[in-house]
């Protein structure tokens, strides 16, 4: 991503691969405000905004997080309820989305695509396995009156048709014609006050399957993308450390030392509190934005992920010990990575009561690590 520093623009390469895309945009037409366009990050709201389409929280395993359901409550402000709409057969980047136009839905924090599998189950699929046939959906304004005729392509960015917060959208799978709906809750779930309903595809569905769309704020969608790249990198790092502990030869272990080091520095800066000399209103706005970032990261399980990284590195008593197992380069970076992990942990909970409360149960565990390792002394407190 891009950031400003010392009056110039910098590319921070640690968050994600440094790939750039060139997108054609029609300069002869305008994009209507408040209408859906390709590439938007949004939430799919059901039932007068009481529920939204989402996946299980970060505390669940990877396989369970492939399932999709409708959930009410605070999830409507969590990153795991964000989706990116990617149009198929793009003429102009960011053009208006029409009724019946094929698109794919990519879940922001996992990077996986909503897919209808051969057995008619609805799951998130890895990018590499997400073929167009299984992942192509479209919006319909009604289940009865389908626009099945061939529509003439409109020059430029197209006509605005689907309005945020206003248009009622039914989601149809392009290849099978099935509709996105929900599995009716059983009596036991109703009695227990369950707030989740499994999302499924059906040839009829329910009368109230219509969804309204809510566009994500730029800061929110940016943070969600940072979460995705960070989770991917840290999990890769943990898998590498686990492989080392099983005494696999270091030459066969994928241990992204440099990427983790750079990412940690970027993240520490990302959560740095605003300068004290700022005007009061500007400072308060930045503090609110910082707290929102902290909350989004915590809700996706990032505090626990940082603790897992610390726990794996604490298996080694010194840089020399780590170097014996992982190699000279890794040994030289052991101390700085461990210190940066403690610093990031502090940045994630600093000034945030909710995150401090969530972390409090791990405090004794952390202090025992701090006391044992001189490399990390003083970094948290």
Residue spans of the language-model regions?
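Lectin-like carbohydrate-binding module/patch detector with strong preference for beta-trefoil
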Residues: 1-239, 335
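Elongated alpha-helical scaffolds that mediate protein-protein interactions in large eukaryotic proteins
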Residues: 3, 51, 111-115, 121-125, ...
């Amino acid at each position: 991503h891009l950031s400003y520093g010392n009056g110039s623009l910098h590319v921070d390469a640690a968050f994600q691969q440094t790939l750039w895309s060139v997108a054609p945009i029609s300069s002869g037409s305008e994009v209507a405000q408040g209408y859906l366009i390709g590439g938007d990050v949004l939430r799919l709201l059901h039932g007068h905004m009481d529920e939204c389409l989402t996946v299980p929280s970060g505390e669940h395993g990877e396989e369970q997080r492939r399932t999709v359901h409708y959930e009410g409550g605070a999830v409507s402000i969590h990153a795991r309820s964000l989706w990116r709409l990617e149009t198929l057969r793009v003429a102009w980047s960011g053009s208006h989305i029409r009724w019946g136009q094929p698109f794919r839905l990519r879940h922001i924090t996992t990077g996986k695509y909503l897919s209808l599998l051969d057995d008619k189950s609805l799951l998130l699929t890895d990018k590499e396995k997400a073929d167009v046939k299984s992942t192509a959906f479209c919006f319909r304004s009604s289940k009865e009156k389908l626009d099945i005729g061939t529509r003439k392509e409109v020059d430029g960015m197209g006509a605005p048709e689907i309005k945020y917060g206003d248009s009622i959208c039914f989601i149809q799978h392009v290849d099978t014609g099935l509709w996105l709906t929900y599995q009716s809750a059983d009596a036991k779930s109703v009695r227990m006050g369950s707030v989740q309903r499994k999302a499924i595809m059906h040839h009829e569905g329910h009368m109230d399957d219509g969804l309204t769309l809510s566009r994500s704020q730029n800061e929110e969608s940016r943070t969600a993308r940072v979460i995705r790249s960070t989770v991917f990198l840290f999990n890769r790092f943990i898998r590498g450390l686990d492989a080392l502990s099983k005494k696999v030869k270091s030459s066969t272990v994928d241990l992204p030392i440099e990427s983790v080091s750079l990412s940690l520095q970027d993240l520490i800066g990302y959560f740095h509190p605003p300068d004290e000399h700022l005007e009061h209103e500007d400072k308060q706005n930045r503090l609110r934005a910082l707290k929102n970032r902290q909350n989004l990261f915590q809700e996706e399980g990032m505090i626990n992920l940082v603790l897992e990284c610390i726990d794996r590195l604490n298996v080694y008593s010194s840089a020399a010990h780590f170097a014996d197992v992982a190699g000279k380069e890794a040994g030289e970076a052991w101390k700085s990575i461990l210190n940066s992990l403690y610093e990031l942990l502090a940045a994630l909970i600093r000034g945030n009561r909710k995150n401090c409360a969530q972390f409090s149960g791990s405090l004794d565990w952390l202090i025992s690590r701090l006391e044992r390792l001189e490399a990390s002394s003083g970094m948290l407190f």
